[in-house]
């Protein structure tokens, strides 16, 4: 009984620790993942640049809201032109909603005219848990010094209705504009909204 309790406590502690690594205004957790072209990509590759992390699941209605309206792509294009690195991360486990292979990921990028710097695969969910990523979309901004400056929702209206996009405050747009202008972000941590990430059980 005691061993069972201690084992459960250890598992709970590990889970809590994994989901508590992310802290605003602290160094962003480093990671290395494979992209949809089979290349190895590390966060450290982009030291000196602003980086956006976007957790995504193409079947999620909340993700569809921002892609079918071209809202996400507009952000990718706007800030890509300003040398911001955009990393779209798929943490759906094999066999679960949102999981795709490399060919499917590249097809989705082409079909949606998306402009991420890379689409990255996190099938065991370890990077998602490092960042306490809970939903799709869940957005993060990292500054050129590698410090996490924003984590949360893409905007202020928690709905899957594209009609709400023009009425919402886009936290990613506001945050990146501030950082690129040498200013600080006012809202550094906001509640994410969307579909739960389909992590490996």
What are the functions of these language-model segments?
Residues 141-201:
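Thiol-/selenol-based redox modules, centered on thioredoxin-like
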Residues 2-11:
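Sec-dependent signal peptide recognition
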Residues 49-50, 65-89, 110:
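Conserved helix-turn-beta segment immediately C-terminal to the redox Cys motif
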Residues 80-121:
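Conserved segment of the thioredoxin-like fold in thiol-based oxidoreductases
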Residues 15-18:
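N-terminal signal peptide c-region/cleavage motif recognized by signal peptidases
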Residues 44-64, 176:
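Short active-site neighborhood of thiol/selenol oxidoreductases, capturing the structured segment around
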Residues 31-51:
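A short beta-strand-turn-helix
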Residues 106-143:
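Short, internal strand/loop/helix patches
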């Amino acid at each position: 009984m005691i061993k069972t309790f201690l084992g459960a406590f250890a598992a709970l502690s590990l889970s809590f620790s994994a989901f508590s690594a992310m802290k605003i205004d602290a160094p962003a957790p480093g990671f290395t993942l494979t992209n949809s072209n089979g290349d190895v990509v590390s966060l450290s590759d982009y030291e000196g640049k602003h980086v956006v992390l976007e957790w995504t699941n193409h079947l999620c209605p909340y993700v569809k809201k921002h892609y079918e309206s071209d809202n996400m792509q507009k952000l990718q294009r706007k800030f890509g032109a300003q040398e911001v690195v955009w990393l779209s991360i798929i943490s759906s486990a094999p066999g679960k909603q949102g999981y795709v292979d490399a060919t499917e990921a590249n097809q989705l990028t082409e079909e949606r005219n998306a402009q991420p710097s890379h689409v990255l695969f996190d099938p065991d969910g370890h990077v998602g848990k490092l960042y306490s990523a809970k939903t799709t979309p869940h957005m993060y901004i990292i500054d050129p010094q590698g410090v996490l400056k924003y984590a949360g929702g893409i905007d202020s209206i928690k709905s899957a209705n594209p009609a709400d996009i023009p009425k919402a405050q886009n936290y990613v747009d506001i945050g990146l504009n501030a950082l690129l202008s040498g200013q600080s972000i006012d809202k550094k941590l906001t509640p994410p909204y969307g579909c739960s990430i389909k992590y490996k059980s």
